[in-house]
Amino acid sequence: AGMDAALQAWGPLGEYLVDAAQRTILFWDVLRRRSDQYQEQKARAVPHVLSFGAELVLDGRTFEHPANYLLVRIIPPAGVVIDPKKRPFVVVDPRAGHGPGIGGFKADSELGVAMRAGHPSYFVGFTPDPMPGQTIEDIMRVEAVFLEKVIALHPEAEGKPCVIGNCQAGWAVMMVAAVRPELFGPLIIPGSPLSY
């Protein structure tokens, strides 16, 4: 009660000081939480923020020309029925971060929408550090093998995989499509910088 009376005596300035103090505490708490999340992600061998279960299909680190990329099959959530004859979808994680963002961090992501429509869905992600001497050409080779594997897993599909490459992943898969066009169905490249 004594503090309230003191603040009331200050009038609007007192209200402002209380508000500023509360907002400052909330701001620092948000930064602390973000730091905790960062440390948790950094401690993972393969950090991601996929909201779907996944199982490893291929690990590009084991290839003749290794790259730090991995292909996983996305496990559909309960109640979602996948039709193996529908065109598979492959979402490639953008290189500019360590999470799928629009690709797969929630039900209304690219993966979520594809699975709700009954499509088998895959995700290409990567580890934080490249393999020693890794080049974009190595990544292209690995991504081509990934697409060959998806095609082999769905021999009765209505078409070749629909590949979605967000941001940097878009121009990377465009390079693969330029040399291996037979591996691709539709190619979607949202936010990909191709006009430099």
Each language-model region and where it sits:
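N-terminal cap/leader regions of alpha/beta-hydrolase-fold enzymes
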Residues: 1-196
